Amino acid sequence: MAFFKKLKEKLFKSSSKLDEGLDAIIEDGGVEETIEAPDVPLDDENAKAILPEPEPEPEPEPEPEPEPEPEPEPEPEPEPEPEPEPEPEPEPEPEIAAQTPAPKAGLLDRLLGRGETKTVVRRELDDDMLEQLEELLIQSDMGVDTALRVTANMAEGRFGKRMSAQEIKQLLTEEVARIMEPVAKPMPLYATKPQVVLVVGVNGSGKTTTIGKLASQFKAAGKSVVIAAGDTFRAAAVEQLQVWGDRAGVPVLTAPEGSDPASLAFDAMTKAQADGADLLMIDTAGRLQNRQDLMEELAKIVRVIRKKDPDAPHNTLLVLDATTGQNALSQVETFKKLADVSGLIMTKLDGTAKGGVLVALADKFGLPIHAIGVGEQIDDLAPFDPEDFAKALTGLE
């Protein structure tokens, strides 16, 4: 629940854009309607709040015990007559209130829920409204195909009906959650030791930070982890992993800058096996400007670690930057060809107004989404929850 609150706060760019856009669509051509509360009798609990409580019956007083007869007292001397008390002055009459309060609803009306009305703007779900919805979803980076499919599903059985902004948001939330539900899967953990996790992604996607967060979380869960800083051409990536490793108490294997990443992966695999580590996480380069070199590099890493374990890597995670929008789709296409991608992690959802790209990815590729990130802290990376994400995206309360 804490992460959902954080997600909702940090997805304010996307949610406010969709939220305000949906409100504007309903306002444009909508008509204000008066809603009267239904005549439904209140339940016992609410009726008690309205009805006066009956006064409790007084308990019978206990009979007094017989008192002993008093001894005869001597006759007192006669007292002087008291002086007459002065007559009290008459109290001034209270002033009449200047305004008479508005009459409250009668008890019967209150019991039946009458007397309370409110207004709501509703608009007919027609072709014009659907077109506006499609444009809004495309602007949020859901993509044309996904936006058309979502609006078509929203209109099914509801075309021609009058709908409020809240009802449209509820519908959109349900449709987004329906698309995301099948892909919301945590990263699988296996009995194999070490479980090799190959992490790929373009430079700047948050790949290195994600490895550090995952390693820290696995270590906190009682797993032993080894990290291989396989992006040997970027000194900053190696240093960043070393910082995360020191913070989490996870060993980080490094190699001289520009050295062979496959050789480092082999050494890391040897150490992880010798130590009986649960997980080996291997960072990789992300230089998409030279795809041929990258493809050969990744293929070599896989060949080398398979000499140690024919089933490795057991997971290949693609880390994506949400701020790249529709470019994330082309990155998935590319890395699916370069490596056998088994799952996605989406980072930087706190910095984009186009969180709908995650819906497009789920709709187009159907790859498992293991986690999403909304910040720099360790707990800002959390398992993907489709309902929480859908509510945060649409701004639904």
Spans of features found by a protein language model:
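Non-catalytic terminal/linker segments enriched in charged/polar, low-complexity residues
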Residues: M1-E175, K185, A220
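P-loop/Walker A NTP-binding module and the surrounding RecA-like catalytic core of P-loop NTPases
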Residues: D145, T173-E397
